[in-house]
Amino acid sequence: MGFHTFDAAEADRLSDPTRFRFCSREELLQHLPTGDGTRLLDLGSGSGFYTDELAPHVGRVAALDVQRAMHGSYRDRGMPDNVDPITAEAGSLPFRDGTFDGIVSTMTFHESTTEGSIAEAARVLAEGGRFVAVDWSAA
């Protein structure tokens, strides 16, 4: 990540429920593995808007954002116990190979996509895992 970042001082704006018109909880969950033992990586988690929707359906979520301040905002709102905030860039993921059953990127993939970040996502995704990217469209 790092091409553009959302102003962490405006993080409350990311909690606006009208964001569901772009992608609902159900639309995300239908494409991701779920269950108590499932580990997900949320790339560009921000203040945790979509992370909160995924957390009740899986064992653990790594909420990765390049801005530590976003994690602070998320903690202030109330971070679920099964969410681990990670401050790192998508091109250098601090996880072992095959760590995650699923990876999700909502409205941030256009900011973090490089050959390196795609290779890193593939590296940390378990065999048979799912990568789901939901992003803006010019249409």
Task: Identify the function of each model-found stretch.
Residues 1-11:
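N-terminal, positively charged/glycine-rich alpha-helical extensions of SAM-dependent methyltransferases
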Residues 9-29, 33:
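Conserved SAM-binding loop and adjacent beta-strand
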Residues 12-13, 18-19, 130-139:
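C-terminal alpha-helical "lid/dimerization" subdomain adjacent to the S-adenosyl-L-methionine
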Residues 41, 46-92:
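Class I SAM-dependent methyltransferase SAM/SAH-binding core
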Residues 91-102:
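A short acidic, Gly/Pro-enriched loop at the edge of an enzyme's catalytic core
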Residues 101-115:
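A short SAM/SAH-binding and catalytic strip from SAM-dependent methyltransferases
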Residues 116-130:
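A short glycine-rich, Lys/Arg-flanked "PGG" loop and its adjoining helix->strand segment in the class I
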